[in-house]
């Protein structure tokens, strides 16, 4: 069994995978002060809900991280409690799958590498627009030959929520929920609707503009923690909340045989 870990700025996704299939998955907050022992305690409690000894079958781990301060704690987690050395995903892993980063600054986050590996594996002959709705919303343009030739980076929905919370004194705290209508008669409902429809309009607007500028016919793939809320966005051809995890597992299997 493989443990795939996706450390994002806001949350950390952990998945147990066997033979390429996700057996179980959890999401915890990302915290730079969480120790290896605390990680192990947390994972043990979550895993025990499925099986008391499920972690005994762990034979490898791969990590995608965009939060460097967390890396040493997660590495210690696997070395100390599982006696394995985890694979940390880097840009060099893109080469193993025939991907080329054709950007002015040819360095991207490990999560984006995993996204592109999985997307290219699933749709090998398509020109792709891969949207990751994380703390930042990243639009990746990948041609059918495996070249990442363009990108757009915009705020994620959690950034919008945080900004409203931090920059306004009287507005209530809220979570983003799917809203059927945009015009509401209460402050709380209006805030929820504004966040939902505002973010959705941003994603649809950027996607529409990318498609307008592109000379290619793009297959649009969406992933990320909040993608389920926005499954009804226009232009999205495929939604896969596990795309990053799939890419992490594929990279592990490629590097470890």
UniProtKB/Swiss-Prot annotation:
GO biological process: coenzyme A biosynthetic process
Superkingdom of the source species: Bacteria
Annotated cofactor note: A monovalent cation. Ammonium or potassium.
UniProt catalytic activity: (R)-pantothenate + ATP = (R)-4'-phosphopantothenate + ADP + H(+)
Residues that hold K(+) according to the record: 132
CDD domains named in the record: ASKHA_NBD_PanK-III
Documented EC number(s): 2.7.1.33
Main location: cytoplasm
Function: Catalyzes the phosphorylation of pantothenate (Pan), the first step in CoA biosynthesis.
NCBIfam families: baf, PRK13318.1-6
Listed name of the protein: Type III pantothenate kinase
Native organism: Anaplasma marginale (strain St. Maries)
């Amino acid at each position: 069994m493989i443990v795939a870990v996706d450390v994002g700025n806001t949350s950390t996704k952990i998945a147990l995978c066997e033979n390429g299939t996700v057996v179980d998955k959890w999401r915890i907050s990302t915290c730079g002060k969480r120790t290896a022992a605390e990680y192990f305690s947390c994972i043990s409690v979550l895993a025990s809900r499925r099986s008391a000894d499920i972690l005994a079958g762990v034979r490898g781990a791969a990590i995608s991280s965009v939060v460097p301060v967390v890396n040493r704690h997660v590495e210690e987690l696997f070395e100390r409690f599982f006696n394995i050395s985890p694979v940390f995903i880097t840009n060099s892993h893109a080469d193993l799958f025939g991907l080329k980063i054709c950007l002015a600054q040819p360095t991207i986050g490990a999560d984006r590498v995993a996204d592109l590996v999985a997307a290219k594996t699933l749709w090998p002959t398509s020109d792709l627009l891969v949207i990751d709705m994380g703390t930042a919303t990243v639009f990746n343009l990948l041609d059918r030959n495996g070249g990442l030739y363009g990108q757009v980076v915009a705020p994620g929905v959690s950034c919008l929520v945080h900004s409203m919370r931090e920059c306004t004194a009287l507005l209530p705290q809220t979570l983003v929920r799917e809203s059927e209508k945009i015009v509401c008669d209460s402050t709380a409902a209006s805030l929820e609707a504004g966040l939902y429809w505002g973010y959705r309009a941003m994603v649809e607007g950027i996607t529409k503009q990318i498609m307008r500028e592109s000379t290619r016919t793009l297959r649009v793939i969406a992933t990320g923690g909040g993608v389920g809320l926005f499954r009804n966005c226009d232009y999205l051809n495929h939604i896969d909340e596990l795309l990053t995890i799939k890419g992490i597992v594929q990279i592990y299997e490629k590097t470890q045989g």
